[in-house]
Amino acid sequence: MRRLTAFGLALLLLASGVARGEPAVTLDPQQSQVFRAWFVRIAQEQLRQGPSPRWHQQDCAGLVRFAANEALKVHDGKWLRANGLSNRYLPPELALSPEQRRLAQNWQQGGGQVGPYVNAIKLVQFNSRLVGRDLNQARPGDLMFYDQGDDQHLMIWMGRSIAYHTGSSTPTDNGMRSVSLQQLMTWKDTRWIPDESNPNFIGIYRLAFLSQ
């Protein structure tokens, strides 16, 4: 990917957001709330159990795609067993139309194309809307987007912590990370501090199919 300044990338994302408009299929406010609960729970399970063998393309954007796709599925006994979960302390089940269940298989890829794969920048450019750069505006399941020049990175705001995948893994490190906001705000590498004064922190994004 060609190198962009953070300011240039922000302008590009803003312009694409204006051109994109609202998705044809969305979740209503109640569905959006339940989706967030499942999305966060599935991301938490990747931290607790390690990445699911059903999760392909394990990186920061892959975590978002996987959690969104699994959140939109029917969470029956077969699904629970496949994901190592019991039926205790789960969010309520999502009542969705067939079109809504396919939302995370039909990401906007640009140029009128849709499909199950998008990278980090296309997740925010074509499939999310900017909320702002103040973390007080973030809701659980919102995305924190960073531009580091040659690379772009996503983290998930979990409500009380932040989850992400580093983009690489080894036999002794599955790449999953969870940090508190306090930890991130005092990070030695200041490029990752989610503060309005940090030009590498582009902002908080919300999946476009969520109505709130």
Curated annotation (Swiss-Prot):
It comes from the Bacteria. The keyword Signal applies. Gene3D superfamilies: endopeptidase domain like (from Nostoc punctiforme). Residues 1-21 form the signal peptide. Keywords: Signal. To E.coli YfaT and T.maritima TM0986. This is Uncharacterized protein PA4490. It comes from Pseudomonas aeruginosa (strain ATCC 15692 / DSM 22644 / CIP 104116 / JCM 14847 / LMG 12228 / 1C / PRS 101 / PAO1). The lineage of its organism: Bacteria, Pseudomonadati, Pseudomonadota, Gammaproteobacteria, Pseudomonadales.
